[in-house]
Amino acid sequence: MSGLIKKTEGVTYLNIKEGKLVSKKNGVLETYDGVKGTISKIEFVKDEYEGKPYEKAAIHISYVDENFILQMHVDSGYFRNFCNALKSGNPKEEVYIQPSFKKDDRGKSMAGCFVSQNGKFLKHAHTKDNPGDLPQLEKVTFKGETRYDNSKQIEYWKNWISKTFAGEATQTQEQEEDGATDLPF
């Protein structure tokens, strides 16, 4: 046994795949419906997959003596739904987070996330009929196709998280340039 401890020791990393939470244990992928606990902090991490950069939210969750880090792409229905539901509850109290995924009749994928507290699913704080201060999607034309830009909504949710978890939400890089910048020599 060693006195050295890795920061991630005792932490279960959870990702989302087609509406289920997944975790790799001993090389085997295990799936779960949801995760329960209290959110202690949320970090925004820049990462890369197959040469394409993206940003993910790393949601730190504690339940009894277990620690989880739920990771989700910031530019996803999972993240937007998670934030919208969490805002209508008490973000500092215990929650149950359950991602969802389905395809519509045309085969279009729809990702979402349900959040419950005290045994009740939380409604979205912002809706189409009552958007409040949530920025509207912007219509843009790209290569002749009309699309919707959600950049302002993503920034809105990141700012809300930073304020809600003040001192606990951080922007980090997957790897620092030097990795040893805080050494005294």
Where are these regions (language model features)?
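OB-fold ssDNA-binding interfaces and closely related basic DNA-contact patches used
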Residues: 1-71, 80-86, 102-155, 159-162
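Intrinsic disorder/low-complexity segments in short proteins, especially the signal peptide
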Residues: 76-77
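Short acidic, low-complexity intrinsically disordered linear motifs used
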Residues: 173-185
